[in-house]
């Protein structure tokens, strides 16, 4: 379960960032997670909430925005992969990965390569500070 080690890194970054900005509470953490990151959002959320117990992030909502895989080709084409095929499977099976890896460019027909969809980025951390009664990002 590599979600635990990922959650540890996210929690540490959230904690350091929140403390650096004088936070009294972390309200929301928004992540951008690539569909090809091999990370289970539910397991990641569970691990994060477990790590956050007793901290300023204890009540934080972990919001995961899924990022679709994208292709690039040497001809200049950039685009997303057919989402219908990906939605059919909740898991990244070897068959689905083989399909994605072998995709041809819809413009020139050459084999394209995966350019995005593997990322895991902290997009935003919404905090509350003692000096302000309103939240800030």
Swiss-Prot record:
**For Zn(2+), which residues are the binding ones?**
73, 75, 105, 108
Which keywords has UniProt assigned to this entry? Metal-binding, Nickel, Zinc
User: By its UniProt entry, which Pfam families does this protein fall under?
Assistant: HypA
Q: Name one GO biological process term.
A: protein modification process
Q: Could you tell me one molecular function GO term of this UniProt entry?
A: nickel cation binding
For whether the record's keyword set contains S-adenosyl-L-methionine, the answer is: no
Residues recorded as binding Ni(2+), renumbered to this chain, are: 2
Family note: Belongs to the HypA/HybF family.
Per its UniProt record, what NCBIfam families does this chain match? hypA (TIGR00100), PRK00762.1 (NF001976)
Name the UniProt record assigns to this protein: Hydrogenase maturation factor HypA
The source organism is Methanosarcina mazei (strain ATCC BAA-159 / DSM 3647 / Goe1 / Go1 / JCM 11833 / OCM 88) (Methanosarcina frisia)
Higher taxonomy: Archaea, Methanobacteriati, Methanobacteriota, Stenosarchaea group, Methanomicrobia
């Amino acid at each position: 379960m590599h979600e635990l080690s990922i959650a540890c890194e996210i929690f540490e970054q959230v904690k350091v960032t929140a403390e650096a900005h004088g936070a009294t509470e972390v309200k929301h953490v928004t992540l951008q997670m690539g569909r090809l990151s091999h990370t289970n959002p539910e397991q990641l959320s569970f691990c994060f909430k477990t790590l956050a117990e007793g901290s300023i992030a204890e009540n934080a909502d972990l919001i995961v925005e899924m990022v679709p895989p994208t292709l690039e080709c040497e001809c200049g084409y950039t685009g997303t992969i057919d989402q219908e095929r990906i939605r059919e499977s909740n898991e990244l099976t070897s068959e689905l990965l083989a399909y994605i890896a072998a995709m041809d460019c819809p413009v020139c027909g050459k084999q394209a390569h995966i350019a995005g969809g593997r990322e895991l980025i902290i997009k935003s951390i919404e905090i509350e500070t003692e000096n302000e009664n309103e939240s800030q990002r």
